[in-house]
């Protein structure tokens, strides 16, 4: 089983990264959050990822995370009934464990619909499963390390700046899921956010689509 990879960054796209180590190049599936944290690195830069090695009847797949905390959160999510690996990865793209705990405690099911293609019964299913297993999430939160590659950024940003950055990333991911190139999505989001104010990513996406 592969539990970690350290090697040369060969290719990076939304959804996956290629890492070369020991003369072998591995394709690793990543969340949009991890993509954003890696995208400013130059190719051939050495990177290290925590790996969850999935093996089932359909084959093998590597899922990569920048921190052990993210990897463990992924394992908690995919272990819930009806939430597979790809849905768990989508959850990580949009929400931290703290976010998810807050959503379930407050009953804000609609918050989960920020995830592309997660609507109605799907969001309700995720909400129900997390609520039924809230103790697992509490144990994860109480035992998880506070170390993270984004802590420094968080300390340097005001709450307003952090909220804006998260909203922007959510809208970009939504556009990417609709088929936009990440660079084009970023450009369109920045353009619309200068003239359109809303805290609802769905409204911002609709405004962008109207302006095209």
Curated annotation (Swiss-Prot):
Keyword terms: Cytoplasm, DNA damage, DNA recombination, DNA repair, DNA-binding
GO terms for MF: ATP binding; four-way junction DNA binding; four-way junction helicase activity
Residues passing through the membrane, by range: none
SUPFAM superfamilies: DNA helicase RuvA subunit, C-terminal domain (SSF46929), Nucleic acid-binding proteins (SSF50249), RuvA domain 2-like (SSF47781)
Region of interest called Domain II, as start-end residue ranges on this chain: 67-145
Superkingdom: Bacteria
CDD domains: UBA_RuvA_C
Region of interest called Domain I, as start-end residue ranges on this chain: 1-66
A Gene Ontology biological process term: DNA repair
Record localization: Cytoplasm
Name of one Pfam family that matches: RuvA_N
Sequence segments annotated as region (Domain III): 163-212
InterPro entries, per the entry: DNA_helicase_Holl-junc_RuvA_I, NA-bd_OB-fold, RuvA, RuvA_2-like, RuvA_C, RuvA_C_sf
Residue numbers spanned by region Flexible linker: 146-162
One GO cellular component term: Holliday junction helicase complex
Protein family according to the UniProt entry: Belongs to the RuvA family.
Function according to Swiss-Prot or TrEMBL: The RuvA-RuvB-RuvC complex processes Holliday junction (HJ) DNA during genetic recombination and DNA repair, while the RuvA-RuvB complex plays an important role in the rescue of blocked DNA replication forks via replication fork reversal (RFR). RuvA specifically binds to HJ cruciform DNA, conferring on it an open structure. The RuvB hexamer acts as an ATP-dependent pump, pulling dsDNA into and through the RuvAB complex. HJ branch migration allows RuvC to scan DNA until it finds its consensus sequence, where it cleaves and resolves the cruciform DNA.
Comment field on protein domains: Has three domains with a flexible linker between the domains II and III and assumes an 'L' shape. Domain III is highly mobile and contacts RuvB.
Assembly and binders: Homotetramer. Forms an RuvA(8)-RuvB(12)-Holliday junction (HJ) complex. HJ DNA is sandwiched between 2 RuvA tetramers; dsDNA enters through RuvA and exits via RuvB. An RuvB hexamer assembles on each DNA strand where it exits the tetramer. Each RuvB hexamer is contacted by two RuvA subunits (via domain III) on 2 adjacent RuvB subunits; this complex drives branch migration. In the full resolvosome a probable DNA-RuvA(4)-RuvB(12)-RuvC(2) complex forms which resolves the HJ.
UniProt-recorded name of the protein: Holliday junction branch migration complex subunit RuvA
Organism per entry: Leptospira interrogans serogroup Icterohaemorrhagiae serovar copenhageni (strain Fiocruz L1-130)
Name of the gene this protein is made from: ruvA
């Amino acid at each position: 089983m592969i539990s970690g990879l350290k090697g040369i960054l060969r290719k990076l796209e939304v959804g996956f990264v290629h890492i070369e180590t020991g003369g072998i190049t591995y394709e690793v599936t990543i969340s949009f959050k991890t993509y954003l944290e890696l995208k400013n690195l130059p190719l051939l830069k050495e990177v290290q990822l925590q790996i969850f090695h999935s093996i089932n009847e359909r084959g093998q797949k590597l899922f990569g995370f920048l921190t052990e905390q993210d990897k463990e959160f992924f394992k908690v999510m995919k272990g819930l009934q009806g939430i597979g690996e790809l849905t768990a990865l989508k959850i990580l793209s949009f929400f931290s464990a703290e976010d998810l705990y807050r959503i379930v405690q407050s009953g804000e099911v609609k918050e989960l619909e920020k995830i592309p293609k997660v609507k109605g019964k799907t969001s309700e299913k995720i909400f129900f499963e997390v609520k039924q297993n809230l103790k697992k999430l509490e144990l994860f939160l109480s035992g998880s390390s506070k170390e993270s590659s984004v802590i420094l950024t968080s300390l340097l940003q005001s709450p307003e700046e952090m909220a804006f950055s998260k909203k922007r990333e959510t809208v970009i991911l939504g556009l990417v899921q609709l088929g936009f190139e990440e660079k084009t999505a970023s450009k369109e989001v920045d353009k619309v956010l200068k003239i359109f104010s809303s805290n609802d990513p769905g409204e911002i996406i609709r405004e962008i689509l109207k302006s095209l």
